[in-house]
Amino acid sequence: MKTCNLTDRMKVKMIMLLFQILAISTLQSVSAYIPDRYIQENVAVRGKATQSDQLQGQWDAFSHASNAIDGNQDSYFYHGSCTHTSGGANPWWRVDLLQEYKITSVTITNRGDCCGERITGARIIIGKNNGLNNPECSTVGIMTAGETKTFRCSHPMIGRYVTVYLPKTEYLHLCEVEVNAMLPAN
């Protein structure tokens, strides 16, 4: 009978492989018995939206804050599903969720027919008051025209107010804002 001499390195690799197999099988069996406690849901559609100001003139009817929570991701401004401010200093858009939620991310659909770069640098802030000093969830980097992008908070944030704040002199336009919150599963 031949004996197999394993080197120390081979023994360590085999032990590590066994631990990995054991860990995976244990996690799979445990997760089968833990029910999902939460579901993710867009709670913005239940809220009330406001903004710092509104584009005036022939397009003011297309510029309302509530357009960003109408459930329509159409990114073409002239179809009437986007918001638009007047281009002043530090514009903001806010949704009052009417109650506090545990928020995990915010999804924004950018204007698609032009001007996609305008939103660059916007801050997404979430908190319990309607001011501009609430904690930051994320900062908007470069978004292309018409792009829909999800901005994840580094940890779930408790808040009633979600604000998109643009700290510069610029137009702020949003075609949809979804606030993704954790709700108890039924």
Swiss-Prot record:
One of its GO terms (biological process) is regulation of complement activation, lectin pathway. Alpha-L-fucose binds at H84, R111, R118. One of its GO terms (molecular function) is calcium ion binding. Residues 1-32 form the signal peptide. Residues 40-186 are annotated as: F5/8 type C-like. It is found in: Secreted. Its main location: secreted. GO terms for cellular component: extracellular space. It comes from the Eukaryota. The keyword Membrane does not apply. The keyword Secreted applies. Keywords: Calcium, Disulfide bond, Lectin, Metal-binding, Secreted, Signal. Gill mucous cells. SUPFAM superfamilies: Galactose-binding domain-like (SSF49785). Gene3D superfamilies: Galactose-binding domain-like (2.60.120.260). Coiled coil: none annotated. Ca(2+) binds at N67, D70, N72, S81, C175, E176. InterPro entries: BG_Antigen-Binding_Lectin (IPR051941), FTP1 (IPR006585), Galactose-bd-like_sf (IPR008979). A motif (Cell attachment site) lies at residues 111-113. Belongs to the fucolectin family. Binds 1 calcium ion per monomer. Homotrimer. Acts as a defensive agent. Recognizes blood group fucosylated oligosaccharides including A, B, H and Lewis B-type antigens. Does not recognize Lewis A antigen and has low affinity for monovalent haptens. This is Fucolectin-6. It comes from Anguilla japonica (Japanese eel).
